[in-house]
């Protein structure tokens, strides 16, 4: 039986196939996916996974914020691709839209995974914020759950930073990219950013997308930053030190929430910056505990695991209700 998970990432669309014990992965850049037809998207899936569309049992999709619904459900029951609005925090390329529509229109059985927001079953105090995390982070969390962990915090650090807490196998809260810890490109709006928005110099979304640690440096993107850090350049190391400090703060805050639920748990790091050894060591030192690192594929693999287990009849995933079939 073949199950596929799709991670709508910041820079790429990542796909994972679970077929028995076999796990395969591939990715399409978001701009690359946007330039493809729906037919070409499906052909890529067939080619990379050596599987026919008709033989796919279930696909689990993530799309953008996922704030228009709160249950895992059939994509046919989703309106507006599961969004309250197409506006929001992040860059629009059209790649995620192309993949979502290709799967929805293909006839392949598919479910959509929601993000966490005010209508989700999380700690009610977290609902002071309208949005907590986008759907692919639940894929990461479910992959960790399938590894045997019931209590944990995971921080996904890349273009932005999002941290999520799971207690007794249920997600209880998360801190979204625009709330606290900065990533490389994105971060919360500070005083200067708010003034720039009020003065019409930036939209709020532009300010968010320019609020990451990269603004402290002369580098133009994440690749340049990480290469410079490998060469020991001071501005790059300061940026990574900054990201590490605030990510550690975010992890500690979620660990505090775990304690209120009577548990303690492991700390995981994910994302292209979270898997950098320098960052791992810094955060582990801040926390006083070893952090376990995940690669960039775990969101897609976790989503494929959700597809597999929903197909097998699971009614709840990480405490989230399932409305399928």
Swiss-Prot record:
Species this protein is from: Methanosarcina mazei (strain ATCC BAA-159 / DSM 3647 / Goe1 / Go1 / JCM 11833 / OCM 88) (Methanosarcina frisia)
Transmembrane region(s): none
Family membership noted in the UniProt record: Belongs to the UPF0285 family.
Domain of life of the source: Archaea
InterPro entries from the UniProt entry: ATPase_NBD, Methan_mark_12
Cross-referenced NCBIfam families: methan_mark_12 (TIGR03281)
Signal peptide span: none
HAMAP family attached to this UniProt entry: UPF0285 (MF_01087)
Name of the protein in its database record: UPF0285 protein MM_0679
């Amino acid at each position: 039986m073949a199950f596929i998970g799709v991670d709508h990432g910041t820079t790429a669309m990542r796909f994972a196939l679970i077929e028995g014990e076999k796990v395969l992965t591939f990715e399409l850049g978001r701009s690359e996916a946007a330039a493809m037809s729906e037919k070409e998207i499906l052909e890529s899936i067939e080619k990379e996974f050596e599987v026919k569309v008709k033989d796919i049992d279930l696909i689990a999709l993530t799309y953008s914020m996922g704030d228009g619904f709160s249950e895992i459900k059939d994509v046919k029951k989703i309106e507006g691709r599961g969004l309250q609005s197409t506006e929001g925090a992040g860059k629009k390329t059209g790649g995620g839209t192309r993949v979502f529509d290709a799967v929805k229109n293909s006839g392949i059985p598919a479910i959509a995974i929601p993000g966490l927001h005010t209508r989700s079953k999380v700690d009610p105090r977290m609902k002071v914020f309208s949005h907590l995390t986008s759907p692919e982070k639940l894929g990461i969390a479910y992959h960790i759950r399938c590894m045997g962990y019931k209590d944990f915090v995971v921080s996904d650090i890349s273009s932005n930073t999002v941290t999520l807490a799971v207690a007794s196998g249920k997600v209880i809260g998360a801190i979204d990219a625009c709330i606290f810890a900065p990533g490389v490109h994105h971060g919360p709006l500070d005083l200067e950013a708010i003034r720039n928005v009020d003065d019409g110099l930036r939209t709020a979304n532009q300010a968010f997308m320019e609020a990451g640690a990269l603004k402290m440096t002369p580098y133009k993107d994440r690749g340049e930053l990480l290469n410079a850090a490998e060469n020991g350049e001071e501005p790059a190391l300061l940026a990574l030190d900054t990201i590490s400090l605030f990510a550690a703060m975010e992890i500690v805050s979620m660990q505090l929430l775990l304690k209120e639920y009577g548990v303690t748990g492991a700390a995981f790091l994910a994302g292209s910056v979270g898997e950098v050894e320098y960052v791992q060591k810094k955060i582990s030192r801040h926390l006083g505990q070893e952090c376990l690192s995940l690669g960039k594929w775990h969101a897609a693999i976790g989503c494929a695991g959700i597809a597999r287990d929903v197909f097998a009849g699971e009614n709840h995933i990480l405490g989230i209700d399932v409305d399928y079939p």
